[in-house]
Amino acid sequence: MADQLVRATAAQGRIRAVGVLSTRLTEEARGRHKLSYVATAALGRTMAAGLLIASNFKQTEARVNLRLQGDGPLGGILVDAGADGTVRGYVKNPQVELPPSPKGKLDVGRAVGANGFLYVVKDLGYGYPFSGTTELVSGEIGDDVTHYLVTSEQVASALMLGVFVGADGVDAAGGLLLQVMPSADGQEDEELAATLERRLASVEGFTPLVRSGKRIPQILEELLGDMGLEIFPEVQLVRFHCHCSPQRVLGALKMMGEAELLDMIEKDGGAEATCHFCNQVYQVKASELETLVEQLRSEREVSSQE
């Protein structure tokens, strides 16, 4: 099944619901970064969370960055997700592997670490970003993002994330986000929020449902079918996509300055650059570096004549 995002409402618009299936894009991230089992689960959960948050943005070019910086051996996670359905991300130490948790599951919480912060930066397409920071709750990512949504954005939220990694790769990945919209007077419906939390808590997890063959509309129907569920007919496809390019690499190298470029030409006969987000390697020839040097000299000459 293609990776996709499904939106819905319930309780006469008081509940906003969105679900994302991100199995393929999580597997692509695993392959690109050569991730361990626990690193795959951690990055996969964070990418799903990013897509769920970005799904509420109005502008197509709007994006959100999630950075988890805990005290665990993964060393940090950074994800960039957009309202256009694209997402990318990486972990600092992708090869880290840990024994299973006491429950027999991948120990994402210990890999990330419970002591640290979640940094969120939103670019809503208006020319200036919005940022928020909250302390990590458990390092399990779902708890941490929920804590951010409730405390920083002040929206009652229930979030479920999951990644199942088998011997041959990612079998299932994605998540659900249920939110109670404030009333006209700004008051929260605490009873409704508690109901959503109980219903999500009663589910054994997102990936078991997906692996049993259920699709997102079916899962939403089970959770909210008795609450006036309305599923939007438009299904948005989501994918792993990075915005890096040879041109951007050259632009970054140019910013290093003439002296550094000349040193690369003399000592290395070129340059090699790797994109952190997608692990794409770019080889830059000496002739391309020489062109950058010429551009810098020309720009400096023009500037001196002004």
Curated annotation (Swiss-Prot):
GO cellular component, one term: cytoplasm
InterPro entries the record matches: Heat_shock_Hsp33 (IPR000397), Heat_shock_Hsp33_C (IPR016154), Heat_shock_Hsp33_N (IPR016153)
Subcellular location(s) of the protein: Cytoplasm
SUPFAM superfamilies: Hsp33 domain, HSP33 redox switch-like
Disulphide bonds in the chain: 242-244, 275-278
Main location: cytoplasm
Post-translational modification: Under oxidizing conditions two disulfide bonds are formed involving the reactive cysteines. Under reducing conditions zinc is bound to the reactive cysteines and the protein is inactive.
Keyword Disulfide bond in annotation: yes
Keywords from the named record: Chaperone, Cytoplasm, Disulfide bond, Redox-active center, Zinc
GO BP term, example: protein refolding
Keyword Chaperone assigned: yes
Gene3D superfamilies on file: Hsp33 domain, HSP33 redox switch-like
Domain of life, source organism: Bacteria
Molecular function (Gene Ontology), one example: unfolded protein binding
NCBIfam families: PRK00114.1
Protein family membership: Belongs to the HSP33 family.
Protein role: Redox regulated molecular chaperone. Protects both thermally unfolding and oxidatively damaged proteins from irreversible aggregation. Plays an important role in the bacterial defense system toward oxidative stress.
Protein's name in the database: 33 kDa chaperonin
Annotated organism of origin: Gloeobacter violaceus (strain ATCC 29082 / PCC 7421)
Gene coding for it: hslO
